Amino acid sequence: KKVLGLDKWYRGCIHSVYPSTTASSITSILTGLTPLEHGIPGWHTYFKDTSSVINILPFRQRFCLNNSKIGNSIPDHYIHFSDEARELTKQMLSLQPNYLSETIYSKHVSNHAIRQSYRDYREFSDVLESFMKGDSGRAFAYAYIPSIDTLSHKYGQHSTQVDVEAEVIGKTIRKLLKIAELNNTSIIVTADHGFVSNSKRRTVATQQHPDFQRMLALPLCGEPRTAFAYIN
């Protein structure tokens, strides 16, 4: 919150779900359910009815020679919603970067929402400002900024690249918070999960453990920080 410059609006800490990854936590935010309930414990999830590991974002088999999509939509029984979340999406604006807004996953979890995309933070701000000033009555907007997550994975959460990006994002959010105060609007700003730095010394490579590899019925699922092993 310090780098973002949001101390004035800070209200306290909340805890992420487990696994504390983007796939699990964003799905929890949009479904109102825990990962155990909604069924997505990681980007790479094993589904029995296809007998394969699926990358849920593009809805592709993880290990496939032609890298083709399994279908044009995710079956309803793959991701579960609370009744409240399902109703909320019917009056929701979903705002995501243009490279994410039309993915099969995004379309599924925002099935009934008005989906819009943005190319930069000016467009991001303009869309939300228009939403807050609009005469639409009671409504809800979900807006996602992935760049802190992306840069933290690449450079580390304490890197200069992350700090510079956070300052730009903070400026955008502070402007929107001030507009919200004038338009009877509440804004909740939160991360979907946190970060813990790791090192190569503390990273286990399965290639170095052939006995363990021989026990696996499938390649590891989930994600590196929370991997799931299906064993023979």
Task: Identify the role of each PLM range.
Residues 1-232:
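Feature captures the catalytic ectodomains and active-site-proximal regions of enzymes
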